[in-house]
């Protein structure tokens, strides 16, 4: 059994395989090796891949360039995930090829929202100091 990463609860093996899948998905999208119709895969960024403990399922967090049409992009990737998986099988030499579930990556929107709240809080503190 692998060692557990204390801050996330993922094993080293999950992290290593996830990173390997992430790198290869990025290459597949850049080179359009999956030949997915109706979207330009060159504009898709894979921000993170999380593996299940049995390494049979990979959650790929994706975001299209500019964050536009995210829901549409994820639904097309999900529809053609068998093509992505086939392209991935040519690149990876692992016992079980994981099933890929594509997920919208909203972390940038979340970070932007937090940054706005921090700026608003700093502005309020500055105004309070000015009037005291």
Which residues make up each language-model segment?
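Charge-rich, low-complexity N-terminal segments
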Residues: 1-57, 63-132
């Amino acid at each position: 059994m692998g060692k557990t990463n204390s801050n996330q609860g993922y094993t080293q093996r999950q992290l290593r395989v996830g990173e390997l899948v992430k790198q290869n998905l990025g290459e597949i999208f850049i080179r359009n090796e999956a030949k997915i119709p109706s979207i330009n895969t060159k504009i898709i960024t894979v921000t993170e891949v999380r593996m299940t403990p049995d390494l049979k399922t990979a959650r790929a967090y994706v975001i299209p360039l500019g964050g536009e049409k995210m829901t549409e992009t994820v639904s097309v990737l999900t529809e053609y995930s068998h093509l992505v998986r086939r392209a991935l099988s040519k690149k990876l030499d692992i016992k079980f090829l994981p099933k890929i579930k594509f997920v919208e990556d909203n972390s940038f929107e979340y970070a932007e929202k937090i940054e706005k709240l921090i700026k608003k809080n700093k502005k309020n503190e500055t105004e309070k100091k000015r009037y005291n």
